[in-house]
Amino acid sequence: MVKLNDEEGAAMAPGHQPTNGYLLVPGGEPPGKVSAELQNGPKAVCLTLNGVSRDSLAAAAEALCRPQTPLAPEEETQTRLLPTGPGEETPGTEGSPAPQTALSARRFVVLLIFSLYSLVNAFQWIQYSVISNVFEGFYGVSSLHIDWLSMVYMLAYVPLIFPATWLLDTRGLRLTALLGSGLNCLGAWVKCASVQQHLFWVTMLGQCLCSVAQVFILGLPSRIASVWFGPKEVSTACATAVLGNQLGAAIGFLLPPVLVPNTQNNTDLLACNISTMFYGTSSVATFLCFLTIIAFKEKPQYPPSQAQAALQNSPPAKYSYKKSIRNLFRNVPFVLLLITYGIITGAFYSVSTLLNQMILTYYKGEEVSAGKIGLTLVVAGMVGSILCGFWLDYTKIYKQTTLIVYILSFLGMVIFTFTLDLGYGIVVFVTGGVLGFFMTGYLPLGFEFAVEITYPESEGTSSGLLNAAAQIFGILFTLAQGKLTTDYSPKAGNIFLCVWLFLGIILTALIKSDLRRHNINIGIANGDIKAVPVEDTVEDSPTDKESKTIVMSKQSESAI
C-alpha cells in the first residue's frame, strides 16, 4: 500500500481547483489499473497499484499539482456530463450501478414512420427534374426555372437550419417530426392546385413548403438513431433512416416518367397525368402525417445506451445552443468533415438534378431510360448505405471507412464521366450504379462520424450543419455544372465535379479520428472509467473536507 503524502506530491494543491467537483487526470498518464478504497476517514487514501511504479505515481501526482489548463473549446461541453458535486458518482463507478438502459420495441415504428415521410419529401424534390423537358413545355418556362424547383430545397435549408436545430434541441424530437411531416403534406396539396399552364408560381409555392419541411427532416436520422437505438445498432438505424430519403429519390426517378409521359401535343392529357401524380403524392403524405401524430413519440421510457443516459441526466439549464454551435466550429476535425461532406453530397445533388439533361444530350428521347439510370444510381446507393451501416456497427472504424468510400466515389465519378458518351446504355447503367453505391453510401457515414467526433454536442445540430454544407455546395455545383453542360458538354461539368471530389479526398485524410461517443460506451461497459478518491490538502471548512474524485477516462482513438 502506498499513501499519497507530501513526499510523493499532493493530489490536490491550491490553485488546482476541481472541475464540477472532480479533478480530471491528464490524458498521458501511464497505463495500469488503478483502484482505490477509502480508509481511516474521508481524508485518508490507499491506492492499490498493478503495474504502476512509485516513480510513475510521483509523476502523476506532480502533474496534478500543476495549474489546470483550460479545456479545448470542443471539450468544454463535456463537463456537463459529469456529476456536479463530490457526493455524486460517475456511471459505471465501482460500487454504484450504471443507469438503467433498455431497448423499446416502438423504436422500429418511429424509424419506419420517419423513413416513409422522408421518402415522400425526397420524391417531391426530384419529381420535376427527372422530366424537366415535360414541365418546361407545360409551363412554358426555361430549364433554369425547372432546375430551381430542385435547388429551392437547397436554398431554403441554409437560412432555416439554425432555427430548425434550435427547435430540435430545445423543443424535442416529436415537435420537429410533426412540423416536417405536416409541411410536407401541406406543400403536396398546394401543388395540386397548380395544374394549369399559367400557375407555375403556385407549383413553386408548394415546392417551397416542401423544401421548408425538408429542413425538419434531414437532421433527424442521427438523432432518432441515438435516442431510440442501442450502441450495436445505432449506425444501422441511422443508415436505415437515410435510406428512406434515398428510396424517395429512387421512386422520384422511376415514377414521374411513367405517370407523366411526354405528350406535349395533348395538353389536356398532360395536365390530367400531372394531376394524378400530384394527388397521389398528397394522399400518401396526408396518411403519413396522421401516423406521425398518433405514433411518433419523443423518446423511450429508458435510454438505449450509457452515452444517451449521460446526456439525458445532464442538467438542461447548462445547455447553450449558441455555445454548442461555437464549439462545433472550433472543432477542427468537424470543420474538415463539414467541408468534405458538403463536397460529396453537393456533387450527388448536382448529378441527380442534371441527370436528365446529361442523358438526353447523348440519348435523344430516352426520358424513361434517364429515370431508370437515376433509379439505378439511388438504389445502388441504398445498398451501399445499409452495408456501410452494418460495417460501422461491427467494426467502429469510422475514419478509414470514410476515406475509402470517398476515394471509391471519386473513381466512380471519373468512370461515369468518361463512359457517358460511348453510346452504350448498359455501360451508363453500370457506371451510374457504381457511382451511386459509393457516393450515396457515404451519407450515413458522414452523419455517424460527425456524432462521434462532436459528442456530447447535439446530433441534430451536427447533422443540420452537415446538411447545410451539402445544400450550399449543391446549389453552387448545380449552377456551375449546369452552365458547363449547356455551354460545353456534360463531360466538362462532370470533370468539374471530379476535381472537387479529389480535393475532398485530401481533406478527409486530414481528419483526426476522435470517437468520443464510442469511448464513453466502451469505457462504461468495460469498467474503464474509475472514480478514485484522493486526499484533499486544501484548507476547507470542516464540512468541505471530503474526498474528491479523479475521473479516469479512456483516451480517445488517435488519428491515423
From Swiss-Prot:
A GO biological-process term: heme export
Subcellular location: Cell membrane
Xref: InterPro entries: FLVCR1-2_SLC49-like, MFS, MFS_dom, MFS_trans_sf
Keyword Chloroplast: no
Main location class: membrane
Extracellular side: 125-142, 193-199, 260-265, 363-366, 421-423, 488-489
Name by which UniProt lists this protein: Choline/ethanolamine transporter FLVCR1
Organism from which the protein derives: Felis catus
